[in-house]
Curated annotation (Swiss-Prot):
GO terms for biological process: cell motility; osmosensory signaling via phosphorelay pathway; phosphorelay signal transduction system; sporulation resulting in formation of a cellular spore. PROSITE patterns: CYTOCHROME_P450 (PS00086), HIS_KIN (PS50109), RESPONSE_REGULATORY (PS50110). Residues 1-27, 42-89, 126-241, 365-451, 579-603, 629-651 are annotated as: Disordered. This is Hybrid signal transduction protein dokA. It comes from Dictyostelium discoideum. One of its GO terms (molecular function) is histidine phosphotransfer kinase activity.
Amino acid sequence: MSSPHIELHSQRTLSPQPSSNNFELTGNKSCALSASLNGSIDDLNNNNNNNNNNNNNNNNNNNNNNNNNNNNNNNNNNNNNNNDGDKNDKKLLIITNAPTPPLTPPQPTKTQQTLLELNQKFQEQQQQQQQQQQLQKQNKQQQSQKQQEEPPSSQQEEPPLSQQQQEQEQEQEQEQEQEEQSKQKIEGKGGGGEEEECEGGGGGEGEGEEQFKEGDEEEHEGIEIDPNLPTTGYTGKRRSSLQINEASPKLIQTPSVDRTLCILDSLPCPIFQIGIIENTENGNITLTGFANERLTTLLSCSSNLLVDSLKSIPSPHYNTVPSLESCNSIPINNLAPGLLPNTDPTKILDPYISLYNKKQLKERYSNNNNNTNTNNNNNNNNNNNNNNNNNNNNNNNDTTTTTTTTTTTTTTTTTTTTTTTTNESDNNNNNNNNNNNNNNNNNNNNNNNEEIKQNTKEGEEILHESTNSTGTGNSISRPNSILQCILDSFHEQKTITEKVLLSNFLIRQQYKSRATIKPFPDGCICIFEYIENINLNYQQPPTSLNDRINSTNKLTNEMELLSLSPDSNHQHVQKLHNHNHNHHNHNHNNTTQRASSTDSPFIHSVSANSLSSMSSNSSVTSACASLSSNSSSNSNNNSNNASSSNCSSNANSNNTNSSSSNCCCCCNNNNNNNTSSTSSTISSASSTKSKSYLHQQHKNSKVYSTLLNSFENLSFLLKSTPIIIWRADHNGEMVFFKKSDEIPIDEKKVVGNNFQDFLQWVPQTYRTNFQEMFQNSLKCGKIFEFLFWFQTPQNYVQLFKIAGYPIFHIDGKDCIASKRYLIGWLGVTYNYLINDGAEISIKGSANLDSMYEKFKIIYEMPNIERTKLTNNGISSGGDITNANNNGGSSESSNKILEKKKHLISEAEKECFLKCKETYNILFKLSLLGVMFSTFKGIILDANDMLLQTIGYTRGDLENGKIDWMLLTPPEHFEISARALQELKAKRWCQPIEKAYIHKSGKRVPVLITSAMIDGSTEQCITFVFDLSRYRQAEMAAIEATRLKTQFITNISHELRTPCHGIVGMSQLLLDSQLTNTQRDNIDSIKRSTDSLISLINDILDFSKLEYGKVTLENESFELLPMIEEVLDSQATAANRKGIDLIFVMGRDYPVPPVIFGDRNSLKKVLLNLVGNAVKFTETGFVLLEISTDYESGDQISLRFTVKDSGIGIPENKIEQIFVPFGQIDGSFSRKYGGSGLGLSFCKELVALMGGYIRVESGDQEGGKGTTFWFAIKVSISSPSYLPNSVPAANQFFYPEYRPSHYNNVIGNGDSPKNVLIIESNQMVIMSIQSILLSMKCECISASKAITALDLLESSKSTENQIDIIVCSDKSTFVQQILDYVTTEKVILYGVDPNSKYNENSKVYSYLVTPITHSKLISSILLSKNLKSKNSFLTTTNNTNNTNNTNNIENKSSIDSPLSITSTSSSIITPILTSNNLDLNNNNNNNNNSILVSNNGGVDGGNNVPSTLTTIQQSQPKKYILVAEDNDINIKVVVRQLEKLGYTAIVGINGLKALEIIGSFPICLILLDCQMPQMDGFTCSTILRQIEPTGQRIPIIAMTANDSKDRCFEVGMDDYLSKPVRVDRLQKTLSDWIKTDENGNPTNSYNFYPLSYSLVYNNFIDTQLKKEKNDD
């Protein structure tokens, strides 16, 4: 057999693996290591360690011991090399053995030949660089020798130079002797035959050439290939029928495979399911597979990679591993018996036979044969071995603090240069220890004899297997690849158990496990159990079979050790911490100069509240080297220098039986003498004590071997994770941060050296808040975490999570961590919305509840044998296996798989295929966009509708150009983040509206909702609904509504303008002297016009409400005047029909007189309801009642009820009346007419005010009438008479503050007035009583004449005499009452203003119904103050001004005008004009001339004198400026002003009004808002600008539009809606014009020139530009 040829290529060391073979793994940081092994390494190892024992069982025991000692020395040399390799993780390690006849490889292909040529060139360059580096090392060693020969004067404790040189010469001689013994040992082992000839190899013992690149910072890409290696390793026997179909699809899914995907993904153990499809014609096999989340997370690879790796089948020879050219990082493979698990990282899954277990068994078998000799021989051998160990220990103890070793292993020579400093004081201690160990060894040999006898049978089997493999070179019966195991299990339908090696190329970790392969009809399932990370938890080989069994039982699922999340379970970390203490020894005798150069600036300990370090042994070694430079020279370990870099132990450990596999037994025997060794030499690099925050008594403790790990080691393990790692010192100052995967964000690297650099990644507005939170968290000294916004250079904001972990020094005595033990901080920062960093993606806890339900559904299917799950365990037939009730253990899932086979019938397969086909059709033809994506933004699949929505093609999707995170605009980041948080918490999210960025750049509005896919923690399905068409339709509808509203507004203005003229002129005619026929005709014209205006207003109001332009204008207002306006508007129609219009307020509870709300909206609702009630009632009554329910504070609920005795509404038509334009069909609709908008408008308006409206109707045929009522909540406002100190809600409890006229009814010392009410209608009586009770009057009612006369007669004989009689003129006994009264004052009411009783001398007042508060109270007050009938005024309806005029004419005997004001309403106060004012005179006189401004001049209008008449000096005129463009409206306003005693000056537009503003002493301005050239708004603005300071002329708006708010904005003072009524005009003028005693205006107004107004100047400039453009 040819000698083995091993070559490992890498640019970065992975980790030293403590093993008996003693060579080191190397590998690239991003891909797998390459390893090519030819020859039986296992056999060479067995020969090197055991062949001599087998051949010389009875004669050569001493020689065997010598060989073992030499082997141990050789191991020490190897450890030196490994120690140097740990100093730099970027070194290239090439281990080659002696050139021996290699295996003859097949001819390489062109591609392989090109790779070999490139490899050869690269090796030549490497050799040149290595030679230069060796020269540099030698120069450094010479310089260090000179420095030691000439120590500084401060080191007075050093021995003389001559003594030091002698010690160095002795050390060099010992090293040379050891090297010669090693060479002899190697030559001796290779002389056994042609197949065992090797030099520098040792069959895996690690003797090889180590070439390091010191200080090389550049990382090499790619993997080098030795040209001497064979291009293929498949030289063994293959299955004749096995051919992998490379052209077949990779993802061919069988029905049974698809059915179990979701189940496997939920299992808590790693499982790999393989589907096998065999072609019976050609024997080809098609493989499909699925790896669950546990396995893919453990190996950091996909299911496709695992399936592809199975297509390369290694040779059946256990001593051959396929070369790198023939296998692409095979993820799953078995391992040769002679190959350690950690030496073949090119395979992810690998069944193996442990070398060290096999070696121990074979040694025991050999020792069992040697039992025929006496125990004295064994003791002699042990003594010889111990003597040899004593020599080694002397060498080890001579080394003080630094050791620099450069080893170059070539074909035949090994050069070693060693600089040491000896110390003879330790030799005696070592000798004593060795003597003790001799006794211990004798005892151990006696104890092992019995155990070896028990294991003889097993040792014979293993030896027989090894002999066959070594001697014959043929394949043994055991399968050599995981695929062959799978195929054997599939064909033979049996379960196969195999030990495998799992390799994770991404984080460069390896795990040993047991694979159980179980067959089923369509393939196999591989279950991996007892997983252990061999890089982190590699243990000492068991010394006995029982130890090996115990160690196997201790192998638990170590997947959690792989977790890179900051909150890893500290129990695992503590286990790793203790494990490293018990099985590794650390030597502090490294070179101080080299250690100081690689000193890590950061130190942390593994404790319960510190971050778990996942570094490999090389990282630990590097950290240990850093410790030695900071600690003093008191070494606690006297082991050999060669093993110092790969060993670590607890400082307080006295265990002599536990050691690393890289250390000889002498390392363990000297642990008791740690305190006796002292340092006599301190290097210059460590002469100055560095500042340390650790206790001095623990500085030199070996506990730092596992506590010290540098930031770079942790970063190395996280090379592929997008986590930002930061560190801070003990003061909380951030000293470094870096993104571990080194992938830039927006082309900028995330790296920095201080906290200010880190703040650059935080948005500007949040930096102060983030800094405060970060600093406060550090002050607490505890683990912290919080969320913050992370800003990229392109201003994209993402939600990040930062976590910090304090690092304490723990002395091993259960001390509690506190701030004084704090030595630094270590933390991580990662994207919170992408899998929660590495926390979720790697830990990946199984959803046990989901797993239980899925298994239950599958195993309860009919027609086949199933395993049924119960809540208490697993039930199969009558057997019940108790399981954990919580259902959360991995053992339960294993029992489920092992209990029964999973079978699926053909009918179920067909059903599944049909469902899958249906799903594909729905997915493709769905009108909704559907996509499958991950939290990282990757879109896995999408249908055509989604691609059409965002504008991308399927090619873009397959090329990975679509990322849903990049499709989201920045303004939708926050709502997307909230949706993702909801999705993670509830596994589904509510629909949200956002936008996607189309490929063209436009924004596409969408409505999306998402849900998590069952069994997955990263993937979700999202449904996207395109809102573009609906948004366009919505905008079109809004625009159409706006145009319609604008059209209706313009049309209504044009229609209402002539209607206002008709109403105004009709009113003027009614005020003149007309015949009854003429008056009736004009009144009909006026009523028709009012109806037309009302209809136009309804259409306009509904249009505004539909468009959304109706807004509430809440203000304080008096409730009674508004109610009276509503009643007065319907009085004429009600009186014409002869129905009673009744008003009742506060029957049960008082109603506040002043409330806070929208007066106009409330009035419109009441007008519609009362108007409809009057319209649809022919006889009877219409009642308006106001009641209240006290809520709390100043909030009350007002209820308005309108009840009538009309035709009623059928029950099935009630809902229809609230629909726009909805009416009751039939003759009633044609009879009464109407637009059908009133009630719908009322409903919307009441809802806008926060109320609701209801309707109650009786039978239409019975005529029971209809009741409408609505309730709104309003606030109570304080009336004007209430002091500010009294709350508005308490006004009812302070009657003394009520208006004075309430008390004027009762004179000083007089008793309350007694009032007799004669009325048959109880509702009318109730209405009158409510008014009289508010005035403290005593009311008595009578419905018949006899009763009334009896009451009058009885009152005269008593003191309670009746003072006032209120009676209706409808009563038949009115005349009898008038004849009987003497001193009583009679007030009559009725519907006819020209009633005959109006001329009766005993009637003091006649009231036209409806009876309101203002009318009745005014009449009672007059009845008290006036003593005769001639002193009374007849109070009539305000709408019938003609009657009022006639009454005034008849009251010519009034000597002086009487004006009585009322706080409740100014309208109820009758104002008398002067006697010389003739309101009936329709001709213009000199006192009331009209001045019309036309073209800048002052001319008379129609029938107006052309010149201004001289103003009489006896009565100065009161001028009012009127700006109006309509001639009819001008005439109406001018005539009304004439009647009120004012002179009008008219301007036809705003510009003309400004020109004449200073020509007359104007006391008020009436402005129309819509005029040509300059409207009223612009004119008002200019007027306010040219006014002097402190002066304000009243400006009253006149317009048909409800633009009240805009009028006030431009400076107007009041508002008059058209048509302008005389009474309202009179009230407005009296409010704003202040007069003296003679009625003359008291204020005069002056104005600046128009040029003072900036608005006027801009207006003129604009007009000039328009004229120029027109020309």
